[in-house]
Amino acid sequence: MDYPPEHIVNQSGPVGDLKITYGGAPDQVIEFYGSTSNPTVLVLIHGGFWRPTIDRSHLQPLAFALSAQGFYVALIEYQRLPGRPYQSLDDVLAALSAIVDKKVILFGHSAGGQLAILAARKITNCIGVIAASPVADLQAGEKENLGDGAINLYLGGSAQNFQDLDPVLLSPPSCRVEIMHTQKDFIPLNVAKNYYEQHKSNSSKIDFTLLADSDHYTLIDPRGAGLVQLVKAVNKVLMNKIGEG
């Protein structure tokens, strides 16, 4: 899919205040934005259908904008290797292990939403997940031929053979999960909402929001109204955590 030069997917920068590596591969890096005094890190996990051609750079403007709102932000990169799906999750977990002495909120967009939900199940310092237009039901996405076969390319096979990577089939994380989808999204509604429908009866910490007059990129473009919606979602997670004690 081609986008005009001004589209958010074609934007990049500013780079983070600090950049660290969490492994030896070029994509095993984290950029940090904002003040380290904040006790909570907002971790951004980009989408792009797990394709090696789409990296974190289009989320740099969002990371910078969120830091200007007072959040301490970590923008992580991870390896995207067709047919090696566990590597992406392993990288996300390795990146998170490099963030010490902080609580984390995971924000994942599209394919990054799938990784965020999976990662939250594996760590103990996560207080919330915000999954925006997430690919949260791999088998449903496969049936929709999402991204022209992106799921099969990512997995290296059929989704039914990778049930341990399919969020809808797994128990939810212990932290709060906010599923956000958009009215004009090219990710089919059921691919995101099935996760909420599957788990809402078993957890009071799962919520679903459908944003009107918005598209797949609204929540990651800080130049529009999506930034306000995202900040509200982050603050909702923070306030609920305070309420839980």
Regions found by a protein language model. Give the residues of each.
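N-terminal cap/lid segment of alpha/beta-hydrolase-fold proteins
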Residues: D2-T36
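Hydrolase active-site cap/lid region
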Residues: L118-Q160
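C-terminal catalytic histidine-bearing segment of alpha/beta-hydrolase fold enzymes
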Residues: K193-Y196, K200-G245
